[in-house]
């Protein structure tokens, strides 16, 4: 074939690779979701298989089996050798149901609960109002019935993996009893206590969420070290008797005035010398990134009245609330890239 005679792309023109990758991002997430919901990774955990065997195990046609296997291999979820497929280390660890770090619940929660609001992201940008559907938008988004149980279940592993890195990165040797405010189903405090045998604490959340936390705490064998306290942190005083308060992935749900109120309530419950720990995906102080924090902030735009904030903003709020020795500790995890900590004067 003769070479083309056209002039081609002018020198210096950037390739559109970034745009095609962004435009088709949904294809990747839905491929992962389809693989989880059809049981692909669970099926391959029983042994490698070719396309016809995979189709038989999943009860699907050979054509979709081949396409799904190829896509998952291209995405780094499967390995292929001589026409046979098996789970990669990542898939084997995180995507097989029943294993301790199973991540599929989070993926399904995003697909079923979070995605509908994202499909109306332009509306959220134009109206400055959440677009994520809730049964009763006039009620608190966290009240019973306004968030499905799958939300709390899906976040459990996500929160556990985040807490694991927090526990390894932040010095908690001087803390004896910690209060996890807005602690959900208890994943964060369970993991912190698992990593630090000297710790005990309290999960504070709404009554129906505390019921879920109680079940998880019992299943983890932590009932002697972790209790629950039902409270609305905007309306009720927080329980005393703790020397640290943790706010893990909480303040991004609310606006600045609400967050200042939450911090004031936390400090009221602490003795002098007690520590407040804010664990979040921190936006860079110049608001240029990073990607995970910036996109989580977009997630807050479509789902809440909050946003992700900078470390500098949290530092100012803690100091204004009466904290000294404010510092930031950085680490990498699914739900946080750092902790901003302050000591009550």
Curated annotation (Swiss-Prot):
GO terms for biological process: antibiotic biosynthetic process; methylation. Pathway: Antibiotic biosynthesis. It is an enzyme of class 2 (transferase). S-adenosyl-L-methionine binds at residue 205. The active site is at residue 252. PROSITE patterns: SAM_OMT_II. Inhibited by different divalent cations, such as Mg(2+), Mn(2+), Fe(2+), Cu(2+) and Zn(2+). GO terms for molecular function: O-methyltransferase activity; protein dimerization activity. Pfam families: Dimerisation, Methyltransf_2. Its EC number is 2.1.1.302. It catalyses: 3-hydroxy-5-methyl-1-naphthoate + S-adenosyl-L-methionine = 3-methoxy-5-methyl-1-naphthoate + S-adenosyl-L-homocysteine + H(+). InterPro entries: COMT-like, O_MeTrfase_dom, Plant_O-MeTrfase_dimerisation, SAM-dependent_MTases_sf, WH-like_DNA-bd_sf, WH_DNA-bd_sf. O-methyltransferase that mediates the formation of 3-methoxy-5-methyl-1-naphthoate from 3-hydroxy-5-methyl-1-naphthoate in the biosynthesis of the antitumor antibiotic azinomycin B. Belongs to the class I-like SAM-binding methyltransferase superfamily. Cation-independent O-methyltransferase family. This is 3-hydroxy-5-methyl-1-naphthoate 3-O-methyltransferase. It comes from Streptomyces sahachiroi.
